[in-house]
């Protein structure tokens, strides 16, 4: 008999389940940032603090804290970690792990056997080793841990994801005047999905600003969200001049 780690399965709702889980994650992250006024990212200041060995936000220290699942990391620490990543040698805004598609295919092949849950965990972890801020792989990794009843580990990884969401949302309001700042295109869609919207169109407005149109929601007037990708494009132009 095959042991299933996901006993309730409706093939028509597999994507809706994921969206519901992500909505819960957003709620947690919004609570985390509720008392924090959004403010613009000062990349010059970020560079100064993360490159100073005597600063509490020295990048190697931040990365060690992050990788050790340190739940004492503040939102300010996460802001310097996330935006400071753009100054690291291995930063590639368009990076995609070779394992990411493997994980996605396994995830949507429901219900899962125990071995398949193990594989989702394994390949999601390998994907995150390649692309540390891949929120989709974080979701899959957390899913596999919960399915295997590793709730403590799942909670630690959930904290990471919640803080990253809060970090992006603390950078603005998603408006033309105060866009959210992201360091990879994927994160634009992650935020849109976390808010419970479905993207319908993507526009490049110039000056490093992008606009994602969303499907209308009943009772909501939101038509879309603005994102600042200027730092991402600045680095891409230097590292990939032929693009």
Language-model features: where?
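Bacterial Sec-dependent N-terminal signal peptides
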Residues: 1-38
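N-terminal alpha-helical interaction modules that lie
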Residues: 34-117, 175-243
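Alpha-helical solenoid repeat scaffolds, predominantly canonical TPR units
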Residues: 123-124, 157
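Boundary/linker segments of alpha-helical solenoid repeat arrays
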Residues: 134-136, 163-177
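TPR/TPR-like (Sel1-like) alpha-helical repeat modules
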Residues: 151-167
């Amino acid at each position: 008999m095959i042991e299933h780690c996901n006993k309730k399965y409706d093939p028509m709702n597999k994507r809706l389940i994921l969206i519901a889980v992500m909505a819960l994650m957003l709620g947690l992250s919004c609570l985390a940032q509720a008392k924090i006024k959004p403010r613009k990212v000062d990349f010059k200041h970020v560079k100064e603090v993360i490159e100073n060995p005597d600063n509490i936000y020295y990048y190697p220290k931040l990365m060690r804290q992050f990788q050790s699942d340190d739940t004492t990391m503040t939102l300010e620490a996460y802001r310097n970690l996330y935006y400071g990543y753009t100054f690291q040698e291995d930063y590639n805004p368009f990076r995609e792990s070779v394992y990411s598609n493997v994980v996605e295919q396994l995830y949507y092949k429901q219900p899962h056997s125990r071995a398949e849950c193990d594989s989702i965990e394994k390949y999601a972890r390998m994907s995150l080793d390649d692309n540390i801020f891949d929120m989709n792989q974080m979701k899959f990794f957390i899913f596999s841990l919960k399915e295997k009843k590793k709730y403590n580990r799942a909670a630690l990884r959930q904290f990471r994801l919640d803080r990253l969401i809060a970090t992006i949302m603390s950078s603005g309001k998603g408006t033309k005047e105060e866009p959210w700042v992201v360091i990879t295109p994927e994160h634009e869609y992650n935020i849109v999905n976390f808010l419970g919207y479905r993207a319908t169109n993507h526009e490049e407005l110039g000056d490093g600003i992008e606009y994602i149109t969303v499907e209308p929601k009943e009772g909501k007037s939101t038509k879309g969200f603005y994102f600042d990708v200027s730092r991402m494009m600045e680095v891409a132009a230097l590292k990939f001049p032929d693009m």
